[in-house]
Amino acid sequence: MKQYIEIIDVVARQILDSRCFPTVEVEVYLEDGTVGRAAVPSGASTGIYEAVELRDGDKDKYLGKGVEKAVANVNDTIAEEIIGLNVLDQAYIDKTLIELDGTKNKGKLGANAILGVSLAVAQAAANYLGMPLYQYIGGVNAKVLPVPMMNIINGGSHADNSVDIQEFMIMPVGFDCFERAVRACAEVYHALKKTLNSKGYSTGVGDEGGFAPNLKSNAEAIEVILEAIEKAGYEPGKEFFIAIDAASSEYYKDGKYVLEHEGKTLTAAEMVDFFEDWVNKYPIISIEDGMAEEDWEGWKLMTERLGKKVQLVGDDLFVTNTERLKTGIEKGIANSILIKLNQIGTLTETLNAIEMANRAGYTAVVSHRSGETEDTTIADLVVAVNAGQIKTGAPARSERVAKYNQLIRINEELGEVAEYRGRNAFFNLSK
């Protein structure tokens, strides 16, 4: 097998994501006829420090959300630069893409254009070598199946309802294999639907497949989930824990946290009190973006108060960016990073962020976006890097289920080598 296999063509197109907005899909063609394809996700609640997602802004087409400019950047500018390069040299190709753009935030070509190419290159290389993507990226040590962080009640920017907190999730930590954990999550999901129905709540779903009922309070979301866990025959605090994505930057206004639906306006210290009360009352194991992306002091306070008890995940805070993560590590802020490929824009930079987190003793949670496609790259990525946790929505809506199904296939392929760490995925928390 050749050690240098040329890229002979790169083709991008505009396709639709799960929220009915356009996104970029890229195909990379190799000299032997091999093809690699990747589609790029898109977020609803986005951090201000994320790499730039290039949109057309033409209100007459897709409400201004078209990506024809990004597609043209791939087909014209990027293709010309990477045709002839060795598909097996991912780091060099990603470096070429970054330099070709020339901006700090990938605002010239668009992170959606660059990421589509970066991921399609990796997929083409894996296909050429005849190996699964997770093995191509991670090598022989890629064997850890992740604990799912399943979003089963949606609020905030992901739903049109009365809940301020964006995501309420279940984590099946008390099981010894991935497939059994997924089954338990599915059973809790169905039990939750019945529970909501019995209380007269809507069972319509949000962007990520979770239910989006008009609950009486944010806390009621946790309470109905705990009820559903028990109805499904499982024990909260043993087999299942709760994870929350507060997405607090969305309700951070003039230095205060405004929980509109609860009629509360809180200081950073009061917001920490709010979450500490929940942690003491409920089996919560993870809180994402509990403080706003600009509130470093609030983050510091939250980490001091809760950092040994629960996983504190930085999403908008870190945006998969090694510079911001380095600052957080130096300040002793958070203890985990959310990994979103399109926040930074290349596979290589994503892997660098995960490596930095691991060296600092931070966990890494590989994540989808609210606007997804059938692309399953993140399922392979989470196994490739042995991250141990994945956040990819409810066990509903095919763009979410596609990732779980890919993980089920990987689990089967790995066989006895596969590991499911359960509670041990939270290696930096007090037991």
UniProtKB/Swiss-Prot annotation:
Organism name: Clostridium perfringens (strain SM101 / Type A)
Cofactor dependence: Mg(2+)
Residues annotated as catalytic: 208, 340
Name of the protein this chain belongs to: Enolase
GO cellular component, one term: phosphopyruvate hydratase complex
Keyword Secreted attributed: yes
Family of the protein in this entry: Belongs to the enolase family.
SMART domains: Enolase_C, Enolase_N
A Gene Ontology BP annotation from the UniProt entry: glycolytic process
Known function: Catalyzes the reversible conversion of 2-phosphoglycerate (2-PG) into phosphoenolpyruvate (PEP). It is essential for the degradation of carbohydrates via glycolysis.
This enzyme's EC code(s): 4.2.1.11
Pathway: Carbohydrate degradation; glycolysis; pyruvate from D-glyceraldehyde 3-phosphate: step 4/5
Pfam families named among the record's database cross-references: Enolase_C, Enolase_N
Residues annotated for (2R)-2-phosphoglycerate binding in this entry: 166, 340, 369-370, 391
GO molecular function: magnesium ion binding; phosphopyruvate hydratase activity
PANTHER family, A to Z: ENOLASE (PTHR11902:SF1)
